[in-house]
Amino acid sequence: MLMEMNRYLSFTLFTGLSLLTTIPIEAYTLNPNKTATSILQTNVIEVRSITSVQPIVIYCPVGTVPQLPYQVWVTYSDGQGEYRQTKWSNSALSTEQSEADDKVYPIGSQYTINGFIIGDDTTENGYPITAKIEVVDTKNTISPKLIAHTIPLNNVKINGNNRLTSNRDLAIKEIISWDVSQQLYNYRDTYGLSTEGYTRSDGWDSPETKLKGHGSGHYMSALALAYAAATNPSHKEILRRNITRMVNELRECQERTFVWSEELGRYLEARDFAPEEELKKMKGTWEAFDEHKTKWATYGYGYLNAIPPHHPALIEMYRAYNNSDWVWAPYYSIHKQLAGLIDIATYMDDKSIADKALLIAKDMGLWVWNRMHYRTYVKKDGTQEEHRTHPGNRYEMWNMYIAGEVGGMGESLARLSEMVSAPEEKARLIEASNCFDSPAFYEPLSKNIDDIRNRHANQHIPMIIGALRSYLSNNDTFYYHVSHNFWNLIQGRYRYSTGGVGNGEMFRQPYTQIVSMAMNGVSEGESHSNPHINETCCAYNLLKLTKDLNCFNPDDARYMDYYERTLYNQIIGSLHPEHYQTTYQYAVGLNASKPWGNETPQSTCCGGTGSENHVKYQEATYFVSDNTLWVALYMPTTLHWEEKNITLQQECLWPAKSSTIKVTAGEARFAMK
């Protein structure tokens, strides 16, 4: 079934015009061929009902679950129409597994799936609908092409006096106030360098936690993004100074691992750390932690982390999430640090510092490749006990709760592979990226089987971002379809109306958002509001995934409609408007209120993503190809399009129902949508 949901209007633009056009955005879910009109006139509500629904016919590739629309076009008794959310009857896992079985539904099979338009009272469950399914001999062989890309953050500025600029300025002032020595403390402690004069870290980077480094990684990203977004020269100078200090001191730590082995005739590498017999006996206690802090010479060439490498090594022994006796999520922490260095390499205009940041990230990325390549493998067949017979089975490593949380390792390693020039390093980094695939999670999704249910939400969303990013280099459509299917399942089954997901950090069963809102606050027989819904990290990562998918589908308005929904309903409101505090979770439900906290990037995971969120609102406002500009968000901004050497200004009151686009400098010819 094809559904057009294009809210963009096309233009051919001749620069030099002072006023181009006004673009309406009202009711963007309405049919673009129809005009939105109010059904509330002179205080009399006109009762209307659904009279018809567009036909739903799905041609389903054999061996997969039909991709059912999460919204369908309905027509009302007054002649108006809009897209409405659906709920389908095939969401039980056993049903989906049957639908994906080519013996049950071979090529040529035809069947129907029933569902409802939710929020309608035609029946107890809603307005009934039916999808007709035909199984076809079509594999997922089409290779989607990258059509567009975003404009770099430093070439888009938010204008005006509004909540967007107020939040940005508040965030930048806070970022420049954070103590850079505190962010360096754990590294110096881990690499045997003096910590005199350095502030001990706190929060989830404190000496009592084994997630050290996650906050420092987010801090580096926040510095880089704030540097790109800042308009105040004195602020930029402080940011530049702190970026420079972070990069120089981290390289000093990393260079302590450059240890030559006469016996091996090469530098010690990641594969040399903790041979198998030693690994099997390795402990995760704080005593062991302190012991490994004294052995930086054994870490292996390029290792850079705020915790010693015995923690990522312990994952190869399938050690559990336990901050006292074993590990927290070591590769999650490594990812944040890689991402921070990559962001510095991307946005720092001091080439020597940008190059050094990239070098640090590359050397650490190659350490990861070395460890994964030589010390890990994938075995999928058999029981869990059989999977774990030998150390290093990635099928089990990345399927563990929390301990196996790797953040966006796949994404960062794929980005690194795009940034380095040596062919061998490119190949190794993309191989390392795919070493963070989770077969137990990916393979059902590749068939559109919903294996999202009951998983830790923010453990798995970044994995999908990594799958999509690696597709750019490995060209394996498996990864694109995993990402595409995941996104569609989120839209249809898991997101709240605000765009967020999760209940107590977990995906629950499909279509149970109302149950979560109603029951999550029940204790001792009494109902009360509970804020543990819509983790902010999840919204952060879903926006990242949506932005990347839109690069392949810039004419499909569903992606940026969702992006806009989540940015405006959760992300922007996750920063206190008067003083710097961000939300961990974003409460919804009767009498719910937002719990404020998270005053530093190391305070919690959402303190980390929160440190980045409010200096990059504009990062997905515009997408471009060679000769097309897509205006994807209606936001008061100034855009400099370097490739065309033109500057455009979008004027609107935020949030707006219309935008005016002006060309303020330069001359070029292109299409605008």
Predicted regions and their residues:
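Serine/threonine-rich, repeat-prone extracellular segments and beta-strand-based repeat modules
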Residues: 78-135
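Extracellular interdomain linkers/hinges and stalk-like, low-complexity segments
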Residues: 41-58, 130-150
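Bacterial N-terminal signal peptides that target proteins for export
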Residues: 2-12
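Short beta-strand/loop motifs in extracellular/secreted proteins, especially
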Residues: 70, 84, 670-672
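Boundary at the C-terminal end of the N-terminal hydrophobic targeting segment
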Residues: 25-29
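Bacterial N-terminal signal peptides
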Residues: 12-22
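Glycan-recognition and catalytic cores of secretory/periplasmic carbohydrate-active enzymes
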Residues: 140-673
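Solvent-exposed, low-complexity, repeat-rich "mucin-like" stalks and linkers
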Residues: 39, 43-81
